[in-house]
Curated annotation (Swiss-Prot):
Nuclear transport factor (karyopherin) involved in protein transport between the cytoplasm and nucleoplasm. Required for the nuclear import of ribosomal proteins (RPL11, RPL16, RPL25, RPL31A), the poly(A)-binding protein PAB1, the HO endonuclease or the tRNA and snRNA chaperone LHP1. Indirectly involved in nuclear mRNA export through its PAB1 nuclear import activity. SUPFAM superfamilies: ARM repeat. Associates with the nucleopore complex. Interacts with LHP1, PAB1, RPL11, RPL16, RPL25, RPL31A in order to import them into the nucleus. Also interacts with the nucleopore complex proteins (nucleoporins) NSP1, NUP1, NUP116 and NUP159. It comes from Saccharomyces cerevisiae (strain ATCC 204508 / S288c) (Baker's yeast). One of its GO terms (molecular function) is small GTPase binding. Present with 16300 molecules/cell in log phase SD medium. This is Importin beta SMX1. It is found in: Cytoplasm; Nucleus, Nuclear pore complex. Residues 25-97 form the Importin N-terminal domain.
């Protein structure tokens, strides 16, 4: 028996103001929760009205957490089977009793969900049926709460494992339909709470797979009619009197939202034939259901347009998304095509226009306005975002319709130009700009677009009456990625953009001006000479802006400037680096110290900005390779590693890798701060880093190639990590280990862990890329041929290795050179091992083939570096393989300094002079064509 009074006392103490008392009480409760009966006692408190509400609420939270954590009986503190049965029965009773308590009810439903999700075979259907069939609203409501949780818990059940949830739906949905029919027209809050639960239950019932219940078409029609009725149902006066922001929180508005949402989701999910969805079903949806939905949606659009029906942003988003899907599906497009221009003019375009609410937001909260209308990471499920997608889709899928849209927006531009004092025309001007910017990719007449920029955008940037139009015009520039041909228009645009960036005090104008500057600079290299003198000033302003407002656009602009104006920024590099480091550490420290356990939108924004800052630092290091930045930037990497900031590991390691390469270039050695960071990283593998090995692999490759040849202090600790990862059974980690070991063999002329790597590579269940072990074997043969062959023999791997090698096709310069050098190494051996001698024919022919293929590989490597197309008739699969391999060509290795053509020439010349018999034997392995090819190569090398 638990100590009830002691537990109750502890619960009360968790609500006092003294942190020390709270902590002690929580520690005691943690010990109490291990005792049988603890969970039942918490439920006693929750269900007893005699206890104070705050005590009951706190107990409910502990109850929920305990059940979520300990429902598994196998746990040491797991709840026992007999207690579970009692808890389940009493949870339902407590929920029914407290369904009007807005504080306790949500916690109880979460608790029930925790049991359902925990793979518990808890059949709630009989209980739900009794509650729903009672005819009493006080029972129907908790019944629907339970149905909602049941559908939610089984939403991912796949075909073949849906028998239970299908039987529940078959039994309960007819009752639910009757309830919905009875209260569908009601406008009171409770009735709409019930309708809300009905719609959400439908959503989760159909989320992943179609319930068997809906195999009968008339049942689908019944639910569609219910949804359509709720979509067009006007809101009561009391809801319309609420502020729009508060209005969207009302359950009656949410019912409308999910009316549209479920219909949209249904079409998005069920528009293709699958194993479970028949052609007959799809035909019924397309030929019967969708036409009915569209007919009603068109009525809703008309009512919304004449203000007789108010729709929330979410409802509009789902409505537009449904229409968008109809545009993409060829069988449905004829249903919507005759109405497309009306849809554009009456729904899509108005959603893209400014309005009184958006302007009020700009005046009241510039930061939130910028986030809402210009932060691509925040747009999400809004009607203007859906409308922008709709416009882009028309350009992509139905380009013939642009002939109707473009004259419309041109007319808006012209009318605003003639009547710019009309605020309603200014609102429409924003819609025209947003429409235009989403069609840039589909307009093949640059001169037409440049004229629009000259005639309409330039004047908008010059006025200060409508600052929302200045911001939108700047965004329009930022979204145009083509090079300008008219230097006069380009000069005007840049000058006005630059002026707005420096002088405006309107935040969205400053942010979008920065983005526009980036786009103009990236797309128009011809203006770089004129711009270069202004770059330090722009960078200073960007740094100031980024301190007061967190958005990744600013980091992207800084990165673009650093990449293209490294010489101009070099004198300011250390100051710039210090500023970037200061900003990053400020954000990172705030994230580390954040007491909240939840991940908020603000956290995401901070992480995005911090990642952008790290990327800018990396670009600085790579672009300003003559500037020593190691001392300035190393603290950033150290902070990320020591504080285990997983969100930034990849970017921090990229920065460290760039710093390591920079150190090698500047000093021809690894600077002490890099070694210190390597020490910290190796230490972190004792705690958290082993799970993120892949992120570190690029740095390990670089340190192996550039650092270990000079200093072997950390060789053994790294090899221990690599050995552990070979045992991890994580395929991509193992492949990275083999890559690192390959570079280790080349740079250190040693072959550690090869035997272990062979054993792992033969595990077919891992599905490793066979090229990994082939390249590692080749590198080891290059480093220590005799020892490598001996290990292969001992592991019974020789035949396997050579078979895989001869069957693989490599495309990179690195891989071809490595193979040539390995073959030469084997052919040079005074006594060819028995395991290799039968392969001399294959090796000699492969040597000539590889040498012949090398010039093309070099040209392709240079083409990739210069951004040009690859040479030769490569299949798409071969091109993909090449681009995977070409990473090897971008790294500096010991092979870079070896001229393999010269090596081949020297080998055959020396062999001919020193061992004519062996020379003849090798030459005779070649047919006449290959002999001629070899002779051409040898003559070419001797002449050059």
């Amino acid at each position: 028996m638990v100590q009830e009074q002691a537990i109750l006392s502890c619960i009360e103490q968790t609500m006092v103001a003294d942190a020390k008392i709270i902590k002690e009480a929580e520690q005691q409760l943690f010990e109490f929760q291990k005792q049988p009966g603890f969970t039942s006692f918490l439920l006693n408190i929750v269900s007893d009205d005699n206890f104070a509400l705050n005590v009951r609420l706190s107990s409910a939270i502990y109850l929920k957490n305990k059940i979520h954590r300990s429902w598994d009986t196998k746990r040491e503190d797991g709840i026992k089977a007999d207690e579970k049965l009692s808890i389940k029965e009493r949870l339902i009773e407590t929920l029914v009793k407290n369904c009007e308590n807005n504080h306790i009810r949500p916690i109880l439903t979460e608790t029930i969900n925790g049991i359902l999700v925990g793979q518990e075979d808890w059949d709630l259907a009989p209980i739900i049926k009794n509650l729903l069939s009672s005819g009493d609203a006080s029972y129907i409501y908790p019944g629907l709460l339970l149905l909602f949780q049941l559908c939610k818990a089984h939403r991912w059940d796949m075909v073949g494992s849906r028998d239970y949830i299908d039987s529940v739906i078959e039994e309960l949905f007819p009752i639910v339909e009757g309830i919905a029919s009875n209260i569908g027209s009601q406008t009171d809050y409770r009735s709409n709470e019930i309708l809300y639960l009905i719609l959400k239950s439908f959503k989760y019932a159909c989320l992943n797979n179609l319930p068997q219940y809906f195999s009968q078409p008339e049942r689908i029609m019944s639910w569609v009619q219910l949804h359509l009725y709720l979509c067009s149902k006007p809101l009561p006066v009391e809801v319309m009197e609420l502020d729009p922001a508060d209005r969207s929180l009302d359950k009656r508005v949410k019912v409308n939202k999910w009316g549209f949402g479920n219909l949209n989701r249904f079409l998005q999910r069920y528009n293709k034939i699958t194993k479970a969805i028949t052609k007959e079903f799809i035909d019924y949806i397309f030929n019967t259901i969708v036409p009915i939905i569209l007919r009603e949606f068109f009525k809703d659009i008309e009512a919304w347009g004449n203000n007789s029906l108010w729709l929330s942003d979410s409802s509009l988003y789902f409505l537009i998304s449904f229409l968008e899907k109809c545009v993409t599906i060829d069988q449905l497009y004829p249903l919507i095509e005759p109405h497309l221009q009306i849809i554009f003019e009456n729904v899509i375009f108005p959603c893209l226009c400014a309005n009184e609410q958006s302007i009020e937001l700009l005046e009241d909260d510039q930061e939130e306005y910028t986030r809402r209308y210009f932060d691509i990471n925040r747009e999400g499920s809004t009607p203007d975002a859906a409308s922008a997608d709709f416009i882009f889709l028309i350009g992509s899928k139905r380009p013939e319709k642009l002939n109707n849209i473009l004259p419309f927006i041109n007319d808006i531009f012209t009318r605003f130009d003639a009547n710019s004092s009309d605020i309603n025309m200014a609102f429409k001007e924003e819609g025209a700009l947003r429409t235009l910017s989403n069609l840039f990719s589909f307009i093949d007449e640059p001169s037409v677009l440049e004229n629009i920029f000259g005639h309409f955008i330039v004047p908008l940037l010059s006025q200060d009456k409508y600052m929302f139009l200045v911001a939108r015009s700047l965004e329009t520039i930022a979204l145009y990625s083509e090079e300008f041909k008219d230097m006069n228009i380009l000069s005007q645009l840049f000058e006005l953009t630059y002026t707005n960036f420096l002088n405006s005090n309107v935040l969205p104008v400053q942010i979008e001006a920065a983005d526009a500057i980036k786009c103009l600079i990236v797309s128009n290299p011809q203006i770089h000479p004129a711009v270069s003198a202004h770059v330090p000033g722009m960078m200073e302003k960007l740094l100031k802006l980024s301190k007061i407002f967190e958005i990744d656009i600013l980091s992207e602009v800084m990165e673009a400037l650093v990449e293209r104006f490294s010489d101009e920024l070099s004198p300011f590099a250390k100051d710039l680096a210090s500023n970037l480091v200061e900003q990053f550490l400020r954000i990172a420290q705030a994230l580390v110290e954040n007491p909240s356990e939840t991940y908020s939108a603000s956290d995401q924004e901070q992480e995005i900005q911090a990642s952008g800052l790290l990327q800018t630092m990396t670009t600085m290091v790579m672009s300003m390779n003559k500037v020593p930045l190691i001392e300035s930037l190393a603290p950033v990497v150290k902070f990320v590693v020591l504080h285990a900031q997983i969100s930034f590991i990849t970017e921090a390691v990229d920065l460290l890798d760039a710093l390591t390469i920079s150190s090698h270039l500047l000093y021809n050695q690894i600077a002490p701060p890099i070694w210190e960071l390597l020490h910290d990283i190796l230490d972190s593998f004792q705690t958290y880093a082993m799970d993120y090995f892949e992120a570190y692999s690029i740095f390990f490759e670089t340190i192996v190639m550039t650092g270990f040849p000079q200093d072997q202090t950390y060789v053994q600790p790294l090899l221990e990590i690599l050995s552990a990862k070979l045992e991890s059974e994580v395929d991509y980690d193992i492949e990275h280990v083999m890559q690192i070991l390959m570079y280790f063999a080349l740079s250190m002329r040693d072959i550690p862990l090869f035997s272990k790597a062979i054993k792992v590579s033969t595990n077919d269940e891992l599905g490793l890329d066979s090229k990994c072990i082939v390249k590692l074997g080749l590198a080891n043969l290059f480093a220590k041929p005799i020892e490598t062959l001996q290990i292969m023999e001992n592991e019974g791997f020789t035949i396997n290795f050579f078979t895989n090698w001869f069957n693989e096709k490599f495309y990179s310069v690195f891989a071809i050179k490595l193979q040539v050098l390995v073959i030469l190494t084997l052919l040079k051996m005074p006594e060819v091992p028995n395991s290799v001698s039968p392969l001399l024919n294959n090796l000699t022919n492969k040597l000539v083939e590889l040498t012949l293929s090398l010039p093309k590989a070099i040209r392709n490597r240079d083409a990739v570096t210069e951004g040009k197309s690859l040479e030769g008739d490569l299949t798409p699969e071969e091109e993909e393989e090449y681009f995977i391999e070409c990473d090897d060509d971008m790294k500096e290795t010991v092979l870079d300094q070896i001229n393999v053509f010269q090596e081949v020439h020297t080998f055959f010349k020396n062999l001919q002079n020193e061992d004519a018999g062996k020379y003849e034997k090798i030459i005779n392995y070649l047919d006449e064509s290959k002999r001629d090819s070899l002779q051409v190569i040898l003559e070419f090398v001797s002449q050059h």
